[in-house]
């Protein structure tokens, strides 16, 4: 019976290790999809200090992107693309607008700032693409 339990333990450990390795130990970004006929969506989540949420969205060259952050004292954000924004910095602006330089996928990171209180808070970020 012990050897059977040991075998199950090893099998479970190998499966967990493989799953962890496939994802690189990191959660995949959430793909932002717009409802049909809509050009904006509101992203909401709760994060603790220094935690961040990663999203990905597609946009075409020439489209205008606007990001609205309602809680600039608690959250900041950055847009990242290896081709267009390789050195993106976190921004605490209430509104940030830019024109998409190249068609493709862009990452949007929302990060909870480190503050004494509240340690956990909910963000509401609006992403508009026109």
Predicted regions and their residues:
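N-terminal secretory signal peptides
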Residues: 22-66
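Sec/Tat signal peptide C-region and signal peptidase I cleavage site
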Residues: 16-21
């Amino acid at each position: 019976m012990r050897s059977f339990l040991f075998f199950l333990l090893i099998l479970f450990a190998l499966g967990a290790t493989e799953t962890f390795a496939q994802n690189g130990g990191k959660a995949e970004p959430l793909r932002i999809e717009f409802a049909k006929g809509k050009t904006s969506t509101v992203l909401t989540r709760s994060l603790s200090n220094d935690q961040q949420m990663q999203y990905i969205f597609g946009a075409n060259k020439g489209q205008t992107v606007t990001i609205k952050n309602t809680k600039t004292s608690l959250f900041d954000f950055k847009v990242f693309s290896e081709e267009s924004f390789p050195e993106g910095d976190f921004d605490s602006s209430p509104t940030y607008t830019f024109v998409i330089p190249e068609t493709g996928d862009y990452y949007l990171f929302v990060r909870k700032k480190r503050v004494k209180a509240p340690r956990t808070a909910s963000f509401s970020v609006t992403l508009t693409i026109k």
